[in-house]
């Protein structure tokens, strides 16, 4: 199985907020975001990072050494800078996609709790696609609920997917994509992306991996959803800063309870 992490965007929103490093390398809980991403996939055989040329050639950023530290045996595909989304990036790196094994495309700006071995088993069971999803309340949805949402039929198959808009007025009751997209083989992935770009399945001129499944649905391929546990969103500066503030608050509360409330009762 191959893990593909497109991280070739410009990251303008973080730049505008004064962040010096590209988003995947900003640290949270003592690790760069991209390391949290890779650690979601223990034991995966192949990892491919897709980075933009501008970042890669900036010697101050040290992109290659940073990525090697995260995953020493990963491939790094360097492509021209663009604003056309992850599917476009993957197509530019197509020579490094493993055509014959299952491929998981994972965005570079979140983490989650989940059962990766179970996800792997289901993707390897012969289906064409598998999308990791979450539902219910998650703190980032207080600010923004504009994510990719799935419509599933009674047989558990994906029949529609759309970006930045829920299908109903109650998005927390719908399956939302976390940003982990499985494809039965790399060939299935590349064929679907080629069709996606040919038909213009994009949002605001960006080719999202969620919308790659549109052509697969139309051709009758089998795509399922896989429910994860907790989802941690770091995609925008606001998401990132909210998470840090919430984590610091609850860490302080835990510290206070242990040191000020419980400690007097258990001095030894």
Predicted regions, residues:
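Alpha-helical elements of Rossmann-like donor-binding domains used by nucleotide-donor carbohydrate transfer enzymes
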Residues: 91-92, 118, 212, 242
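Conserved N-terminal catalytic core of the sugar/cofactor nucleotidyltransferase
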Residues: 2-5, 13-15, 27, 31-105, ...
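A structural signal for short hydrophobic beta-strand segments in well-ordered beta-sheet cores
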Residues: 25, 150-152, 225
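Conserved alpha/beta core of the MobA/IspD/sugar-nucleotide pyrophosphorylase nucleotidyltransferase superfamily
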Residues: 3, 99, 174-268
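Conserved beta-strand termini and adjacent loop/short-helix elements that scaffold enzyme active sites
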Residues: 50-52, 77-81, 132, 164, ...
């Amino acid at each position: 199985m191959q893990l593909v992490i497109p991280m070739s965007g410009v990251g303008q929103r973080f730049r505008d907020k004064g962040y010096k490093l590209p988003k995947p390398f900003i640290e949270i809980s003592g690790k760069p975001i991209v390391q949290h991403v890779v650690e979601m996939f223990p034991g995966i055989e192949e990892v491919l990072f897709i980075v933009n040329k501008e970042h890669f050639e900036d010697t101050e950023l040290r992109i290659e050494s940073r990525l090697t530290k995260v995953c020493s045996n990963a491939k790094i595909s360097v492509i021209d800078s663009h604003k056309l989304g992850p599917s476009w990036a993957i197509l530019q790196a197509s020579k490094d996609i493993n055509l014959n094994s299952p491929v998981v495309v994972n965005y570079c700006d979140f983490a989650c709790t989940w059962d990766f071995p179970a996800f792997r088993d289901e993707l390897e069971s012969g289906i064409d696609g598998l999308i990791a999803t979450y539902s219910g309340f998650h703190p980032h949805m207080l600010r923004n609920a504009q994510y990719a949402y799935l419509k599933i039929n009674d047989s558990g198959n994906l029949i529609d997917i759309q970006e930045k808009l829920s299908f109903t007025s109650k998005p927390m009751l719908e399956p939302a994509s976390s940003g982990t997209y499985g494809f039965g083989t790399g060939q299935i992935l590349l064929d679907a992306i080629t069709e996606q770009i040919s038909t213009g399945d994009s949002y605001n001129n960006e080719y999202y991996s969620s919308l790659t499944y549109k052509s697969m649905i139309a051709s009758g391929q089998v795509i399922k959803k896989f429910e994860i546990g907790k989802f941690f969103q770091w995609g925008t500066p606001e998401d990132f800063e909210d998470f840090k503030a919430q984590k610091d608050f609850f860490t302080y509360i835990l510290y206070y309870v242990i040191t000020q409330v419980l400690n007097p009762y258990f001095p030894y």
